[in-house]
């Protein structure tokens, strides 16, 4: 297919819009990163213009058969250079024709296609090497698409990606690359969760429930100890009240020991002694054991 045909021009415009959309996506995912030479508004405007140009090209009146025949005749009439086969000249012409290029503040790792690096070399008057890539399906499907990547500016950083030719491999072969390009590694990391099933899930719920119960009981014990300390301070001069507190603390369940027939002091103790003075009732009623 002729590189300057309307169809190829439309493809170039769509690819450029796709590149701008990917850059805008990265900027929206990382708003604090360096904005680069183009603002978000400029990127959005470029996306709209590229798709508008593609639609305009595809909607234009196609060439007539006479125009196509005339174009083919003019190309065929030019003699090939000596010592160079026509097939080799056709491949070289395709490879030397710059399809389109993209300058971005970050390297374009995912552009919707799978690439394989086959070379790298230093460039004159440049501090950064240039990397060379070809389509991963170059041998399997005879896809001649290639690209070059190089950092052309340091401050602010600018990476130039130059594409040559167009992909002739099937679209479904690049679904993995498109799927990866549509995801953000940070989003994948944030969305990672562990799912538990069966006994593991029941054990996790039981562990959380037991931990909560122990925490509540610990808080109740602290409050109870604080109340007893305050009660001791108030009743420090009342020996009978002190004896009641000691009996309460020495009981296994935190309650008063039961009466016994042995005639112990706890059985003979008269609880009315605690309230022989009505003026002190307010002091005792504020404590609950």
From Swiss-Prot:
Predominant location category: nucleus
Entry keywords, A to Z: DNA-binding, Nucleus, Transcription, Transcription regulation
A Pfam entry, by short name: WRKY
SUPFAM superfamilies, per the entry: WRKY DNA-binding domain
A GO CC annotation given for this chain: nucleus
Function recorded in the entry: Transcription factor. Interacts specifically with the W box (5'-(T)TGAC[CT]-3'), a frequently occurring elicitor-responsive cis-acting element.
Record-given protein name: Probable WRKY transcription factor 38
Organism: Arabidopsis thaliana (Mouse-ear cress)
Lineage: Eukaryota, Viridiplantae, Streptophyta, Embryophyta, Tracheophyta
Gene this protein is translated from: WRKY38
């Amino acid at each position: 297919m002729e590189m300057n045909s309307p169809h190829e021009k439309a493809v170039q415009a769509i690819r450029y819009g796709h590149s701008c959309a990917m850059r805008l996506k990265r900027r929206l995912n990382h708003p604090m990163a360096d904005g680069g030479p183009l603002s978000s508004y400029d990127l959005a405007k470029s996306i709209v213009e590229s798709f508008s140009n593609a639609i305009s090209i595809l909607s234009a009146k196609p060439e007539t058969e006479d125009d196509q025949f005339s174009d083919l005749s003019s190309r065929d009439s030019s003699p090939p250079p000596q010592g160079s086969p026509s097939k080799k000249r056709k491949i070289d012409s395709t490879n030397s024709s710059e399809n389109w290029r993209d300058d971005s503040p970050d390297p374009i790792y995912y552009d919707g296609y799978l690439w394989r690096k086959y070379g790298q070399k230093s460039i004159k008057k440049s501090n950064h090497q240039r990397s060379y890539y070809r389509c991963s399906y170059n041998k399997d499907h005879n896809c001649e698409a290639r690209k070059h990547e190089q950092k052309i500016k340091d401050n602010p950083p600018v990476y130039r990606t130059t594409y040559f030719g167009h992909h002739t491999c099937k679209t479904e072969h690049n679904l993995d690359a498109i799927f990866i390009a549509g995801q953000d590694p940070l989003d994948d990391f944030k969305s990672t969760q562990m799912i538990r099933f069966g006994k593991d899930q029941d054990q996790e719920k039981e562990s959380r429930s037991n931990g909560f119960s122990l925490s509540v009981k610990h808080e109740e014990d602290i409050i109870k100890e604080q109340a007893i300390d305050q009660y001791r301070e108030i009743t420090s001069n009342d020996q009978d009240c002190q004896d009641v507190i000691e009996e309460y603390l020495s009981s296994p369940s935190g309650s008063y020991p039961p009466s016994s027939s042995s005639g112990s002091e706890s059985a003979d103790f008269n609880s009315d002694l605690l309230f022989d003075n009505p003026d002190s009732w307010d002091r005792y009623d504020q404590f609950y054991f």
